[in-house]
A protein has these predicted regions:
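N-terminal "pre-motor" subdomain/linker immediately upstream of P-loop NTPase catalytic cores
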Residues: 19-154, 328
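Conserved C-terminal "switch" segment of AAA+ ATPases
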Residues: 362-379
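Conserved alpha-helical scaffold flanking the Walker A/P-loop in AAA+ ATPase domains
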Residues: 264-270
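Active-site phosphate-binding and catalytic loops of NTP-dependent enzymes
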Residues: 91-95, 255-264
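Short gly/pro/ser/thr-enriched loop/turn and capping motifs at secondary-structure boundaries
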Residues: 351-355
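P-loop NTPase catalytic phosphate-binding loop
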Residues: 1-24, 58-63, 67, 141-261, ...
């Protein structure tokens, strides 16, 4: 008898939760309508009208007709009002947890535990416009801590690297997109991401990646990579940084001459598979606006000049710049370099001013925890939780590529491949 009563209560609870879950969808429709009315997103004659709604893995998509006289920009300006209005303190109970209840034990206590452990649902909102207003309500929560697993590299092809998890799911970045601006305050995830990027490239492209690492914060972050065969140079001060950048400039000039001679417009048309990644961390230590002393300032000016040239013409020649800073200010972040970096990845920054320098908008100062980043490309902006990779994982993955011997000087020759008529690098030891 007790079992039957208990079962009835549980089944009734499940039915109630299912009903509430369905009714919450219509509640969101009503809420959005009311929020828009209170925010003045109406005309005298009309307000937004629901056209359709659709359930996705990541949440709900609501499509509205907007009244004549209102623009998409009007709704974009009120996105914070829509987001805050849709969020509340109600807890969400997972029905699967109710199905796990053991009726032979204290089922009432089990229900109380399920209710007390229920999570608050923090929704996010994105807007799109294609003649209709699309309001995407993202319900999938981002992980607080995402540990790196080597298996995710299997989801990356060619020059893709794992970026992390968004509310839509797993996301990766293609290094073929061009240069990257990377920013983030101390201990917020920037250095861990750099190590993930380097490790992924060595592991995925051991035969075709070349790395020049410029670490002007002491060189310790890149120390475990310095003996990898893929690493051309590691610079830890202004003098060695200038030497490395001059070397890259010289290579680029030879590459341009070879392209011109062979009638190739860019690296893809030439069929050359090698990519040279130049990572500069920290931009403030290479900025002539920050460096003091006449000689040092001149070295910094030459470094910045070289970086500007790499950013301007390097992408088409197979060079990829990753330009990093902990302290992004207008004095530190060279405008010419930044404008040629199509991709921006930024972790939490000190204030909205720093965020605007990097992103051209505020927001990075509000990122809540380490590893949480804003990923901005010409295709749009997303919030992502990036993976944390341990030093032990790094050493295990790059160990086959470590060589404990002085690297010999190399000369480079470019020629047509015989089998598939593609072009390739011929490296001669001197």
């Amino acid at each position: 008898m007790l079992f039957e009563i208990s079962s009835s209560i549980i089944l009734g609870s499940i039915a109630s939760i299912s009903y509430l879950k369905k009714s919450s969808l219509s509640n969101d429709v009503d809420k959005i309508q009311k929020i828009c009315q209170h925010c003045g997103l109406t005309t005298k004659e009309d307000s937004i009208q629901i056209y359709r709604k659709k359930r996705h893995e990541w949440g709900m998509e609501y499509v509205y007709r907007i009244p004549l006289g209102l623009s998409f920009a009007d709704f974009e300006r009120k996105i914070d009002h829509i987001r805050d209005g849709l969020n509340n303190k109600k807890k969400i109970i997972d029905i699967s947890e109710l199905l796990k209840i053991n009726f032979r034990k204290n089922w009432l206590r089990q229900i109380k535990e399920i209710i007390s452990n229920a999570k608050h649902l923090q929704k996010d909102v994105e807007l799109e416009y294609d003649g209709m207003l699309h309001i995407k309500v993202l319900e999938k929560a981002l992980p607080i801590n995402l540990k790196f697993d080597e298996s995710i590299l299997g989801r990356c092809i060619d020059w893709e690297i794992p970026l992390g998890i968004t509310r839509y799911g797993f996301i990766k970045h293609d290094m073929e997109r061009g240069h990257i601006t990377l920013a983030g305050a101390t201990r917020k995830g920037k250095t861990v991401f750099l190590k993930l990027l380097i490790t992924s490239l060595i592991y995925q492209q051991p035969e075709t990646v070349k790395l020049s690492l410029i670490d002007l914060k002491g060189g310790l972050a890149f120390t475990r990579f310095k003996n990898a065969i893929q690493v051309e140079d590691v610079a830890t001060d202004l003098d060695s940084a200038l030497e490395v950048l001059k070397k890259v400039q010289s290579e680029m000039e030879k590459m341009k001459g070879w392209f011109d001679k062979n009638g190739s417009e860019d690296i893809k048309e030439a069929g050359i598979s090698t990519r040279h990644i130049i990572i500069v961390d920290e931009a403030a230590q290479i900025s002539p606006n920050i460096i003091t002393g006449k000689e040092e300032k001149e070295k910094a000016r030459k470094c910045e000049e070289a970086l500007s040239e790499i950013a301007r013409i390097g992408a088409g020649l197979g060079y990829r710049l990753v330009y990093c800073s902990q302290y992004p200010t207008a004095d530190v972040m060279n405008k010419q370099i930044k404008q040629n970096c199509d991709t921006v990845i930024t972790y939490k920054l000190r204030d909205a001013i720093a965020s605007r320098v990097v992103l051209d908008e505020s927001g990075a100062e509000k990122l809540p925890l380490p590893g949480r980043a804003i990923y901005k490309t010409p295709d749009g902006t997303q919030i992502v939780q990036t993976p944390f990779i341990t030093n032990e994982q790094i050493e295990s993955m790059i160990k086959p590529h470590i060589v404990f011997k002085p690297r010999k000087e190399q000369s480079y020759e470019y020629r047509k491949g015989e089998k598939n008529r593609s072009n390739s690098f011929i490296i001669k030891e001197v």
